Amino acid sequence: MVALRNGHLRHSKGAALTRWRALVFKAAYEAARGLNVDVPLDGPVRLRLVFVLPRPKRPRFWVPAVKPDLDKLVRAVGDALCPSSGPRVLREDSRIVHVDAHKVYADYPIQPGLLCWVSSVEGVRK
């Protein structure tokens, strides 16, 4: 859903999306620094993403074939790793060359959230 504000289209859930991206960035940045990884990464990378969604009381499907759309979730992660200002995990989100993404329902002990792995693509020629 979008809303028109000051002549510009804006996502109606923009504030929540901004907070979510900030949390994803903070977790990824701190993980990279904790592993002594120099950021921002400036080579080809692959992402492995598992979006863990809350399980409804009566799910229609055994997997979350429901909103939010997987492609939009993946895009939000790319945007989170490469914010428009400040420090970054990736120099550019165009450095993402492979994505393996899944949506699953949360089951104890796994809580809703995001599991994210970023790895460099080996064999890059200079």
Region locations from a protein language model:
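Acidic, proline/glycine-enriched N-terminal capping motif
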Residues: 1-126
